[in-house]
Amino acid sequence: MSFQLDQSTSVIKTAPPGRLEFKNEPIDIASSNIQDLAKMQTLDGYYQQTSLQLPQSQQYHRMYENVYNNQQILYAQTQNFQYPSTLLTNGSLAQTEWRGQQMDTSAYSNTGYSRSSTSQQPQYTQQVTENERIVYKPVDMPSPVDSGIGGDISILNPKEEFFTSADGGSMLERSSERTLSHRDSPLVIPKLYNNLGFQYVLEAPISTSVRRDDDRMTYVNKGQFYTVSLEYTPDLNKCLKSQTVKSQLMVVFREDKTYEEEIKTWQSWHARQHVSKQRILEIDSKNSSGMIGQIEEIGNNAVQFYWNPSDPSGVRISIAVQCLSTDFSTQKGVKGLPLHVQIDTYDGENDKVPFHRGYCQIKVFCDKGAERKLRDEDKRAQKRKVQEYTAGALPGGRKKSDGEYHDQCERSEFYHMRELDKPAALFIAPEEFEPRYVDSTSLSFDMSEIEPIPTKRPRTSERIMLYVRKRDEQIYQPLHVVPASLSGLALAIANKFGADPDKMSGVYKRCAKGITVKVDDEMLRLYCNEDTFIIDVEHATDGSTAATLIEVAPTNPNSYSNS
């Protein structure tokens, strides 16, 4: 049925019954100047589209990648448009046939397929080499682990699940690729799995909120000592050539930093410390055993010792980490960065590459934060189990996280690292660096590659600690001098001994030689930090107060020269 539009009334009128109009006949709705449609050029070629059959994005197991090597980058759920040859300026492009290329999937039929999400979000798969394959796809929420990484865009390596057909049996094979996001570390560390050879264990409980596909996370407290045990089980496939081995235990960054970046980060951390001799890694020698000789400090973040692998008791060394994971966060409120307790063991004395390298991922908290973190995770785990039990009791329900997280364990086993060539970053503080006291042969890198150490100079601090007591007392009291000046000392004395800081007439120091000097800012900053004194506070009749600090001579006269 045709229709006619009356322009005066804008009312559509239908044609009388029985009237036939051909499709090529002009219609009255057109203006009078374009009524003759027969003289116009046909534009069907500009709008006609070939029927499209867009290929579905499919991802196949790696064993079938070689079957389709010639396939280039495949973009799923995209739109293609046809352009006529008259609109193309490049003649070579005009010969290109525009059609949706249907993927030939005959090589994959009834063989195996990759189960992926049914979400309508686009997936982009780039088929390149085995080591360069990157897949960008939506992913479920990662484990609630505080990795400290900022909210960057996720670059994801999905966990592939490959299923064989019914003829091949039901087999599930999970690849070694990790699921990554902004909430856990983007670093995938190649590992070796071997129950023989060197085995290291950190005596601290692991987190139960980390997925099995991610490395175990161990929470420790700053300054608290934990035991690390080293043992060796003979491996016939990789035998030792020496009876005594050298091990270097260190604290390093988990992030994939270069050697220079890691050293600069440690330098920045050390510059913020109040004590110039502050170490990153502390050792309790009294509670350590199994070493041959003494434990050597080869860096602020590393120690070295020798031991006999054939000794069945192995080595037990007590360590404490003196830095926080939040010390390396660039923004306030960002979760702390994870660190590694790394052990490099050398078979030969002069070997540059370690025979074995193991690591344990840790996160360092303050004020018993590790225990609080573990308690919170235990509560979440119990709540998760209740939800799983409820979901499993419903018809068709299943426990989604069965075996998904690491089980609770009071000991954290070290992973065996595959890469051994990367040199360990041993940080030596500028104030402690003396070339004549450092044996370059004991280091695993060339000393000439280290940047020149700045000239040694006195380190000024914003805080000074003094230990004082009255004559009739036996216990010393700490005086926190903030700021590190005479006014700060007067304020500390007034607050500690009940005087008015505005009426302090003077502060004096009586040296061990018997002379009395008036304390000034330079003397306080350069010569009095962590010294011990007997204090005399005298109150005058006019309300003023004077304090005299009497230096206590050390019991060992050589203790000052050795410090």
From Swiss-Prot:
Recorded phenotype for the gene knockout or disruption: RNAi-mediated or conditional knockdown result in defective cuticle formation. RNAi-mediated knockdown in L4 stage larvae has no effect, but upon reaching adulthood, over 95% of the embryos produced by these animals arrest and fail to hatch. Development arrests at the three-fold stage, showing abnormal constrictions or puckering in the external cuticle and approximately 8% of embryos exhibit ruptures in their cuticles resulting in the extrusion of cells. RNAi-mediated knockdown significantly shortens lifespan.
Superkingdom of origin organism: Eukaryota
Region described as Interaction with DNA: spans on this chain: 326-335, 372-375
GO BP of this protein: defense response to bacterium; determination of adult lifespan; ecdysis, collagen and cuticulin-based cuticle; molting cycle, collagen and cuticulin-based cuticle; regulation of transcription by RNA polymerase II
Keyword check for Transcription regulation: yes
InterPro entries attached to this UniProt entry: CP2, TF_CP2-like
Region (Disordered): 377-405
All copies of domain Grh/CP2 DB, residue ranges: 194-428
Sample GO molecular function, one term: sequence-specific double-stranded DNA binding
Principal location listed in the UniProt entry: nucleus
Subcellular location field: Nucleus
Bilayer-spanning residue ranges: none
One cellular component term from this protein's GO annotations in UniProt: chromatin
Keywords: DNA-binding, Nucleus, Transcription, Transcription regulation
Summary of the function given for this chain in its UniProt record: Probable transcription factor. Binds a motif with the core sequence 5'-C[ACT][TG]G-3' in regulatory elements of target genes. Many putative target genes show oscillating expression levels, perhaps as a result of rhythmic variation in accumulation of grh-1. Plays a role in proper cuticle formation and/or barrier function and is required repetitively during development, for successful completion of each molt. Involved in modulating lifespan. Plays a role in defense response to bacteria. May act upstream of the p38 MAP kinase / pmk-1 pathway.
Similarity annotation: Belongs to the grh/CP2 family. Grainyhead subfamily.
UniProt-recorded name of the protein: Grainyhead-like protein 1 homolog
Species in which this protein is naturally found: Caenorhabditis elegans
Gene designation: grh-1
